[in-house]
Amino acid sequence: MYRPARVTSTSRFLNPYVVCFIVVAGVVILAVTIALLVYFLAFDQKSYFYRSSFQLLNVEYNSQLNSPATQEYRTLSGRIESLITKTFKESNLRNQFIRAHVAKLRQDGSGVRADVVMKFQFTRNNNGASMKSRIESVLRQMLNNSGNLEINPSTEITSLTDQAAANWLINECGAGPDLITLSEQRILGGTEAEEGSWPWQVSLRLNNAHHCGGSLINNMWILTAAHCFRSNSNPRDWIATSGISTTFPKLRMRVRNILIHNNYKSATHENDIALVRLENSVTFTKDIHSVCLPAATQNIPPGSTAYVTGWGAQEYAGHTVPELRQGQVRIISNDVCNAPHSYNGAILSGMLCAGVPQGGVDACQGDSGGPLVQEDSRRLWFIVGIVSWGDQCGLPDKPGVYTRVTAYLDWIRQQTGI
């Protein structure tokens, strides 16, 4: 019987160093491949902005929709933003959709038209026409399921450059840097402000030296404190500057007129409010634009967060600082502020207190006239106070005292026509 010859096999072993090298090389190649894949899927993305104009067929326009400060404006804008957000978060674009913001409500016949800016993130190699088509498809679903908001179904979207999107958003008052970029992240933090963090803040300079703060409330008017002009109210001696640095400002503005409240009383700090009219209108940018005036009925509850900004001294009798600083404080009720151990009845109805119980965070010399602001649910900023007076700076139970802006809205409108 035929039997194949037995072949003697020789065992061969790879060098352990070679094995180790192959394993390590394989792991490295795999790691690099995964890293590149993660990068291109998660990080190699670009932001894209789109604008859509929604015609609301069953909402009648009225004067309360003129200002983002009114509850009616906030409610309607919030409903539209929530509807858009919910629609995209439940769609196949849930991971690409970032945020939507109503930039403006305006009259359209007897109805309302809402101009909305939306932000998405797609990988860079996505086709623009394809992205737009996908977004429009989702919006059409929304228009068919818009609840009790009747929206014209012929709505279309327009692609915007980053600058064009910013231009839409800065024309609305109170837009901070996170709103202008439609970012989901807050930029606040620390005590030294970043450029553009508080774009309405101005420095009022007497004979070219920083003297007081102020706030742009439109492109022609600055809101500030009356006591800033006790020594000199000649407009020719004043200029206003924008930017976080008083040494290297971004913009210089000449002053045409200074309007001080007729009933300002320096002894009691009553009616400590003034307006500065500029010689020329300001062209708004992402770093320079106005803060919102509040509605007369705006709620400013005790304990709520507010921010005060300025170039004032960091301690009582200290020197002003060249870079803008910010401080987080809490609103304090007038009853608490009027307690015997605090201001013992000196806080009047046209005043507002803010600080921290233990002291340490406060406005100080050089901050006078600057803004105390709060952010609403739509991330718009409103000026609720004007730095007015206080007992030294940052003492416990001696918070900063501010002019209550809601008490002077009629006066502001009479002077400015805003």
From Swiss-Prot:
One Pfam family recorded for the sequence: Trypsin
This protein's record includes keyword Signal: no
Listed PROSITE patterns: SEA, TRYPSIN_DOM, TRYPSIN_HIS, TRYPSIN_SER
Tissue: Located in the cells of the submucosal serous glands of the bronchi and trachea.
Entry's transmembrane regions: 21-41
UniProt-recorded Gene Ontology molecular function terms: peptidase activity; serine-type endopeptidase activity
Keywords: Cell membrane, Disulfide bond, Glycoprotein, Hydrolase, Membrane, Protease, Secreted, Serine protease, Signal-anchor, Transmembrane, Transmembrane helix, Zymogen
Extracellular side: 42-418
EC number of this enzyme: 3.4.21.-
Location(s), subcellular: Cell membrane
Example GO BP: respiratory gaseous exchange by respiratory system
Lipid bilayer topology: Single-pass type II membrane protein
Glycosylation site positions: N144
Residue ranges of every copy of the SEA domain listed in the record: 46-163
Lineage: superkingdom: Eukaryota
Active site per UniProt: H227 (charge relay system), D272 (charge relay system), S368 (charge relay system)
SMART domains referenced in this protein's UniProt entry, alphabetically: SEA (SM00200), Tryp_SPc (SM00020)
Cited InterPro entries: Pept_S1A_HAT/DESC1 (IPR017329), Peptidase_S1_PA (IPR009003), Peptidase_S1_PA_chymotrypsin (IPR043504), Peptidase_S1A (IPR001314), SEA_dom (IPR000082), SEA_dom_sf (IPR036364), Trypsin_dom (IPR001254), TRYPSIN_HIS (IPR018114)
Function: May play some biological role in the host defense system on the mucous membrane independently of or in cooperation with other substances in airway mucous or bronchial secretions. Plays a role in the proteolytic processing of ACE2. Proteolytically cleaves and activates the human coronavirus 229E (HCoV-229E) spike glycoprotein which facilitate virus-cell membrane fusions; spike proteins are synthesized and maintained in precursor intermediate folding states and proteolysis permits the refolding and energy release required to create stable virus-cell linkages and membrane coalescence.
Family the UniProt entry places it in: Belongs to the peptidase S1 family.
Protein name: Transmembrane protease serine 11D
Organism: Homo sapiens
